[in-house]
Amino acid sequence: MDADHLKTIPLFSSLSEKALRTVAVFAAETSVSKGKRLVHEGDYAYDLIVIDEGTADVIKDGQVVASLGPGDVFGEIGMLEGGKRTADVVATSPMRLVTLSKWDLKRIENEVSEQLEALAKERAERDRDPARPS
């Protein structure tokens, strides 16, 4: 993953150049097709996912409860807390995703501690919005 491209993604935009280069080493970029189930409700969460391009629906009990697009992040609550996915997320268009595993975040947390704080704030906001997936 290219550090310059990471800087264009809102989650990473405030990181220093050094931190961006560190994250770029560990971030995995994946392309998926429309209809692909990105996460399954009830599965254990081991990574956070950032939508770089495309859109997805969050599905809970068979109902679409939210739509996600570029810049949106999901999976970080379950990943940080070691919990299970709280909803299915399904691609509604071709997508490009950036993922970071729990283990990768542990390895780079000194470089990106300010970003982890931002994730904690995001989590607090999600606690107030049950439509957001973990």
Question: Model-predicted segments: where are they?
Answer:
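A short, polar/proline- and glycine-enriched secondary-structure boundary/capping micro-motif
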Residues: 68-69, 77-78, 108-112
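Regulatory nucleotide-sensing modules
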Residues: 3, 7-61, 68-70
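Short hydrophobic-aromatic micro-motifs
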Residues: 50-51, 74, 97-99
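Short beta-alpha junctions and helix-cap segments that line functional grooves
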Residues: 61, 74-77, 84-86
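A small-molecule sensor/coupling module
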Residues: 2, 17-22, 85-86, 102-134
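Ligand-binding loop in jelly-roll beta-barrel domains
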Residues: 80-103
